[in-house]
Amino acid sequence: MNHHKIVRVRDVMNPDFDIVDGAMTVKDALMSMKHPENKCFIVEKRHEDDEFGLLLVSDVARKVLADDRAANRVNVYEIMQKPIIYVDPGMNIRYCARLLERFEITRTPVIENNEVVGIVSFTELVMGGMRDRWEGA
């Protein structure tokens, strides 16, 4: 029987992320980005009954750059994804990887008590969850 310590999303997630207002222009969002390694922005809720959104850098490439649209004339809400799939920080990384794979997404917010606490991607799951465990063995 395999008795490995269960690695949780909270153990590998990136707690640093960029959060933007959906009414911002894409240009303003890109200019404000402090964590480009995440390749995404969390879009704030507008009110209590709203949901978080997600804007990937690849969305900007496809829906602004490739379509030859002006980034200073496109608002984040026009091209963001909403509603989004998110995970709990207590989730086992194996299930998180399966969820990302099943829905063909590469990264997702980590939400606890209705607040974003981090971002997790396949990179964090593999490098932080698998590789680091092998190094500690």
Regions from the PLM with identified roles:
Residues 1-137:
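Tandem CBS (Cystathionine beta-synthase) repeat/Bateman regulatory domains
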